Each structure stands twice: as structure tokens, then as C-alpha cells.
């Protein structure tokens, strides 16, 4: 199971401004997930365009007519039998990217997608069967997952940058320049 969700169009780094909602329905014991605007579209998730079957989705938690801020939910996005998107889920491919094309990045919109209550990640905060919200001991814990994932991307990209720099330095150390004057056989080596 490949679980990744990274960005949304409206956010940048302002996680509290997240537009995606997860509204708890105590009658059915389900959360209803929505991306109510175009800017709430989940954007750039790795593996989402063609391969991922599940995603960790961050959404504003609503229960008992009150918003409790961003929380994580596990969402199945594709059928495990024929790999088609599930009802209410619109998936797309964001196309070519500069420097990170090997990752299958996509987009996702949600329209009244219902998931069971137990698909909310409830290690630090909880929603009881009747919809009562139990807050985490430390409210900053909710932001740890997003911060960790962003740090991992920086670490991965720094490895790519180090490899590219090594190739560039090695190539420039042995590269021959063109003739300074036609017919002159003197070559200059470029060294950094």
C-alpha cells in the first residue's frame, strides 16, 4: 500500500488554512470528505496519478458543528480489483515535472466521499461514536507528519543535487575547450 499526500493548491505552508473538510456523521459513524473548491485540490501527491490505492489525507475535522483543525485520515482512492477511482474521487496526472519525473505525481478532488470513523488516525486525538472530540495532549503533534515528510523530500533532493554536482565537477575537470584560434592545437582544461 503506497500512502502519500503532499500538497494542496491553496496551502503553501499554511496548514491551518486547509480547505478540505472531514465532517463526522454520528448516524452512520462515518466521515464525509470534501474538497469544496478547486484550490482545495490535493496536488503533487507521489504515486497518486496511476499507482496508489490508498492515501493519507489531511482535512479540517468538523464534528458537532465545530471545526477542530487539520487531522489525518486514511482513504482508499482506487478499487483493488480493477484499479479505477472510487465513487466521489476524481484523480488526475499532473504531467511532466522538472527534475523529479520518476515519481508518479497526481491530483485528487473529493466529493462527499464517506469513510468509516476508524479511518481517522486517532493516536493523539479522537472522535467518539457520538461525535465528541477528544483533543491531543499537545496540539502541535498534528503538524509533525507534514513537517517530517517535507524534511524527507529535502533529504532526497539533496542526494540528487550531490550526484549532479559530482557529475558536473568531474566532467568539467576533463572537458576540452575548443581551439582558441583556427588550426591551433592548444586545448585548455577547465578545472573548478
Regions inferred by a protein language model and the residue ranges of each:
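Short Pro/Gly-enriched beta-strand edge/turn motifs at strand-loop
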Residues: 2-6, 88-92
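Sensory/regulatory domains in signal-transduction proteins
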Residues: 6-14, 39-41
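Short Gly/Pro-enriched turn/cap motifs at secondary-structure boundaries
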Residues: 10-13, 97-101
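Generic recognition of stable, solvent-exposed alpha-helical segments in well-folded globular domains
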Residues: 17, 52, 56, 68, ...
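Generic, well-ordered alpha-helical scaffold segments in large soluble proteins
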Residues: 21, 60, 76, 109, ...
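A short core secondary-structure module
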Residues: 26, 30-90
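A glycine-rich, basic-preceded beta-loop-alpha segment at the flavin cofactor/substrate interface
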Residues: 45-47, 83, 92, 109-149, ...
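Non-transmembrane, amphipathic alpha-helical segments
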Residues: 102, 146-153
Amino acid at each position: 500500500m503506497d500512502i502519500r499526500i503532499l500538497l494542496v493548491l491553496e496551502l503553501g505552508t499554511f496548514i491551518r488554512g486547509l480547505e478540505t473538510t472531514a465532517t463526522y456523521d454520528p448516524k452512520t459513524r462515518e466521515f464525509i470528505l470534501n474538497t469544496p473548491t478547486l484550490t482545495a485540490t490535493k496536488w503533487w501527491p507521489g504515486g497518486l496519478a496511476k499507482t496508489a490505492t490508498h492515501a493519507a489525507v489531511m482535512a479540517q475535522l468538523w464534528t458537532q458543528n465545530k471545526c477542530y483543525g487539520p487531522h489525518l485520515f486514511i482513504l482508499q482512492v482506487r478499487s483493488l480489483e480493477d484499479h479505477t477511482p472510487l465513487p466521489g474521487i476524481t484523480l488526475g496526472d499532473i504531467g511532466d515535472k522538472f527534475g523529479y519525473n520518476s515519481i508518479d505525481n497526481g491530483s485528487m478532488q473529493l466529493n462527499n466521499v464517506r469513510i468509516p470513523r476508524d479511518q481517522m488516525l486517532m493516536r493523539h486525538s479522537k472522535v467518539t461514536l457520538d461525535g465528541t472530540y477528544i483533543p491531543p495532549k499537545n496540539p502541535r503533534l498534528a503538524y509533525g507528519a507534514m513537517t517530517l515528510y517535507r524534511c524527507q523530500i529535502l533529504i532526497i533532493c539533496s542526494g540528487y543535487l550531490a550526484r549532479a554536482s559530482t557529475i558536473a565537477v568531474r566532467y568539467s575537470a576533463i572537458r576540452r575547450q575548443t581551439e582558441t584560434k583556427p588550426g591551433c592545437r592548444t586545448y585548455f582544461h577547465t578545472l573548478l
